[in-house]
């Protein structure tokens, strides 16, 4: 059974939005825009934001608009971030709802989602904030993640669920971000 996303239980995980990778991502500008929007909303709502960077010496640093919004960045060499002890340690924060976005959808994002699910974690995959070089790879990743047990959400769906209602103290600020 699916539950509404809960800001008090959430951690936002931004996978590998890096300088040399983003220019080759299909609809990369939209992926980045959605990622920035979610990271800003997470900041307003007190949701931890963890980033990963796959071999930054080869793929570049996390892109500046995202880097400025991260609470922590974990460098990695494995495609599945769960294979990195610092990543798993960062998730020991008492929050059990892991919201994943980033690139590439069919490699590091998918393997991290599968790794989290294997570890019995609750995972939400943000469909409009993930990307691959080819759209068909992104769609295959969404299908596989869903079949494995991840819930597929959109960025706006997520933000409105995080707030719960229009009386939320940050509603106006987040609405302004969305529009």
What is the meaning of each model-derived region?
Residues 19-23:
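Short acidic, Gly/Ser-rich segments with clustered Asp/Glu that frequently serve as metal-coordination loops
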Residues 11-17:
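N-terminal nucleotide-binding beta1-loop-alpha1 segment
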Residues 17, 54, 128:
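Active-site loop/turn elements of alpha/beta-hydrolase fold enzymes
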Residues 2-11, 45, 57-179:
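Active-site-adjacent betaalpha module
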Residues 7-10, 25-56:
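A short alpha/beta connector and helix-capping loop motif
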């Amino acid at each position: 059974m699916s539950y509404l996303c809960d800001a008090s239980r959430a951690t936002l995980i931004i996978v590998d939005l890096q300088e040399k990778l983003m220019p080759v991502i299909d609809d990369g500008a939209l992926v980045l825009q959605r990622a920035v929007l979610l990271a800003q909303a997470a900041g307003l709502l007190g949701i931890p934001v963890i980033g990963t960077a796959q071999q930054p010496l080869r793929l570049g640093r996390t892109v500046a608009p995202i880097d400025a919004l991260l609470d922590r960045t974990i460098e990695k060499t494995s495609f599945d971030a769960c294979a990195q002890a610092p990543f798993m340690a960062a998730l020991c924060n008492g929050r059990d709802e892991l919201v994943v976005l980033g690139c590439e959808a069919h490699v590091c994002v998918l393997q991290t989602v599968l790794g989290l699910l294997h570890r019995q974690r609750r995972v939400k995959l943000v469909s409009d904030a993930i990307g691959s070089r080819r759209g068909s790879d992104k769609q295959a990743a969404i299908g596989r993640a869903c079949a494995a047990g991840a819930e597929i959400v959109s960025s706006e769906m997520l933000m409105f669920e995080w707030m719960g209602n229009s009386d939320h103290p940050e509603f106006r600020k987040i609405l302004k971000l969305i529009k």
